[in-house]
Amino acid sequence: MKFFAVLALCIVGAIASPLTADEASLVQSSWKAVSHNEVEILAAVFAAYPDIQNKFSQFAGKDLASIKDTGAFATHATRIVSFLSEVIALSGNESNASAVNSLVSKLGDDHKARGVSAAQFGEFRTALVAYLQANVSWGDNVAAAWNKALDNTFAIVVPRL
């Protein structure tokens, strides 16, 4: 689960260049449009990057089609999306910067302990953005807001790995 909490990494916006209220609104509204698709989001990441799936002992080496409809998969996907939702909800408000930093720092620390690399965080980012592009109204403004949020997240996570 915590690896995909990495996903959270995709949504911060409280660091070097915090998200503006407008940027946060774009990230939040686009996330709201897909956040109920927990299983599909995680399945898209695993399909694009099987090495990420193999980081989860309960899913490692298994056919994605055989695990996608299981309770364990749905539970894990919900944990990841819920973490991301929390970070996204906090973004765009300067008074929440410390909370976002704490959450994302812990994410980095937890994933370091699991041997997750910066490259795998990058893979997760790529898969998440591809999922968003295919499932939400995606223009240059939305892309820029997500890129800024993800860049901010990586600025916290990567040094901790």
Curated annotation (Swiss-Prot):
Limits of the Globin domain: 18-161
Recorded superkingdom: Eukaryota
GO cellular component labels: extracellular region; hemoglobin complex
Swiss-Prot/TrEMBL keywords: Heme, Iron, Metal-binding, Oxygen transport, Signal, Transport
UniProt GO molecular function: heme binding; metal ion binding; oxygen binding; oxygen carrier activity
Residues involved in heme b binding: H76, H111
PROSITE patterns: GLOBIN
UniProt signal peptide: 1-16
Note: There are at least 12 different components in Midge globin. There are at least nine genes for VIIB variants.
Protein name: Globin CTT-VIIB-10
Upper lineage: Eukaryota, Metazoa, Ecdysozoa, Arthropoda, Hexapoda
Gene name of the record: CTT-7B10
